[in-house]
Amino acid sequence: MRNKTWVFVAGMMVIYAVFSLLGGGVELRVVRLFEKHEAELAEQMAAFEETGELMGAENWMDVTHWDGEHDMVEYTVTAAGDTYYGFYYSPDDVPLACQNTEVPLTEAEKGWAWRAEGDNHGYTYQLKENWFYFEASF
C-alpha cells in the first residue's frame, strides 16, 4: 500500500512539473497576454493620453487609472488567493508600486520590490518602454 501511495505522489509531482513547465505559470501567462494585445494596448494608451478616457480593455480585464506624482494605468489580469497579477502603463516610464501606492521601491533580482504596512508587498519589472509587469500581495 505504501509503495502505491509513493508512486501516486511521485506521478502527481511529475504531472504538476510538466504542466508548470508547459503553462509557464501565472507570470508567463500575463506576459503573453500583454504581448498578444500590445498593439491594441498602445492604441488605448495613445487615446487615453489624448482624451483622458480609458476605453477598450475593460471587457477582458480590470483597468484602473491611478493618479500620483507619476500616473499609471493598471491592468489587473488575474488573482490567486491574496496575490494579484497584471501589467501597467507608466507614461513617465518609471516603475511604480501597485495602485500607485507611495512606498519606496528597492532594486530586486530583475526589477523592483516594495513593501507597505502589514504583509502588503509586491514586485515589478519592465516589459518594454512604458510597460511593466506586476505582482501584488495583500
Regions found by a protein language model. Give the residues of each.
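N-terminal Sec-pathway targeting helices
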Residues: 1-15
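Phenylalanine-focused residue identity feature
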Residues: 8, 19, 34, 48, ...
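N-terminal export/targeting and maturation segments
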Residues: 16-81
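Extracytosolic and intramembrane catalytic regions of membrane-associated proteins
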Residues: 52-138
